From Swiss-Prot:
The chain crosses the membrane at residues 5-25, 45-65, 87-107, 124-144. It comes from the Eukaryota. Coiled coil: none annotated. It is a multi-pass membrane protein. The keyword Transmembrane helix applies. The lineage of its organism: Eukaryota, Amoebozoa, Evosea, Eumycetozoa, Dictyostelia. Keywords: Membrane, Transmembrane, Transmembrane helix. The gene is tmem50. Belongs to the UPF0220 family. InterPro entries: UPF0220. The keyword Transmembrane helix applies. Its main location: membrane. GO terms for cellular component: membrane. This is Transmembrane protein 50 homolog.
Amino acid sequence: MRKTIMKYLPALAGIIFTAGWFLWIDGHVYENTNNKNADFDGPHIQWIYYLPGIFATLGMVMANIVDLSALNSNSLLFDGGATKVRVWLFISFAISFGCIGAALWIMVAVFLPPHNTNDAAQWPGIAITLQTSLIFLSSLLLVFKKVRQDDEYDQF
């Protein structure tokens, strides 16, 4: 059972990643469709609202291009490889958390009341928050798969 789950974990991460971007595209299309109505008074999506998703994707790539076998080093201070990997992973996860924070900020400051009084215009803000959260979740699943793959041969 465990091997089957580990086998399909990257596919699940890809589905979650795709769902995140799909939700954001859906939110943007929803906003553009509503803007064609003459009585729509909601906020308009600007190019800067794409940045949390783009940087969350960058953080996911950064977390998954690193070789995690370098973390198995015994010496913390003398081995530069393990320290570099730890710093790289810290930066990638800091970028991902920052993107979630930026998406929450955009949602609260632009798309939710009292800044936006139109209830129909709240979906893009929710979509951008879901997007960055799902991208981060897919990144965690892929890193977990890599960690468990390294531990697969350990019996203890």
